Amino acid sequence: GNSMLQRVTFTDWLDLFREIANYRPEEKKVLVIDEFPYLVKTNAAFPSILQNAWDEILKDSNVMLILCGSLISMMQKHALSHDSPLYGRRSAQIRLKPLPFTDLYAVQGQPFSHAVEQYSVTGGVPKYLEFFEPGEDLYRQIQEVVLSKNGFLYEEPNFLLKDEVQSANSYFSIIRAIADGNHKLGKIAGALGMETSSLTPYLSTLIDLDFLKKATPVTEKNPEKSRKGLYFISDNFIRFWFRYVYPYKGELELDNQQIVLDELEKDFIQKFVAFSYEDICKDIFASLCRSKAVDFAPSRIGSYWLNDINGDTEIDVMAVDHQKKQVFAGECKYHNKPVDATVYYELEEKVKKSAELRTAFPGYKVLYGLFSKSGFTQRMLDQAEGRDDILLIQEDCVLWLPPSMRNSASTFPPLSECF
């Protein structure tokens, strides 16, 4: 390193940047400013100072400048927006997302069910994963890290929201309403006693901050304008916190953690994890497609639902391959018994009775997928082997891949070897 930089105190930012640019000028250097928003909070003029430094000193030097920040709204405002002094000077931007389940599972080396249940709590946020050791008792770790008043994640959503928005209580109420099962715009507004027009800006902000996501059926040609959109909590830990911590804050403040542990025992696997498993299955299918283990090129992977006079129709995983004119419909079962052919027959019936699907994808071949934690009955295995349109995935193994979905790269190894 530069010993002078270790000894000298600079009173002027430009002098510091000039020294960095002039240090071994023939060599490429990377200058990283971490937590840029907090620097701006302490010195509101810093974006203008940095603009001047870039234009006058760094732009034509051998320096790559990287600005990092965990506050999305402030990075947008002070580094990316049209009003920022730095506007127009970036060469690229990276918005880091949580790690996908498939990437984590491939390196963690723990049983599939443990990985799914841990991911349902932590998502793919590396900092959260530091507190959850693979293979350790998950409920004990939840108790220590999340339910304890001294736990690192006990107040995490409070810290995240208060750093990003004003009137955090209003946003908390919206997230709580969604956590309670209100997913349609009208139902969320009704639960809060708000007009939908007043609610929409709050929802947009929460989506921009990755707290929420708006999902639409894969049949929608213009998802942004769709009136069938449903709102969900996008972050696994935030969803967990609002389900198992926020409603019991009073009890937890009195060190009564047992009430939450009882709730976890009652429905964590059957309801909470089973819901997360649907997103994991979408990730698994996307990974199989990317690795070309499955000959399917999806333009979109999501879900499908329809409420009409014939009742409610829901399909957990749905993907469309416009190139080959094929549709994938999948059902996800996270329970302790093998999936029987009855599940396949019900899925097939859902697809066949949907006039909307036939209209949206005329002439498309339908491929069916069943994702199971606990395998399949012999009747289901026999059914798949005689068909060219059924994909079976048990935990981390592709048990059956129909010939129509195979290519030269198609194999039947554990999924962790496919990703």
Predicted regions and their residues:
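A cross-kingdom feature that marks ATP-driven nucleic-acid transaction machinery
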Residues: G229-F419
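Phosphate-binding site recognition
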Residues: G1-Q258, D262, N407-F419
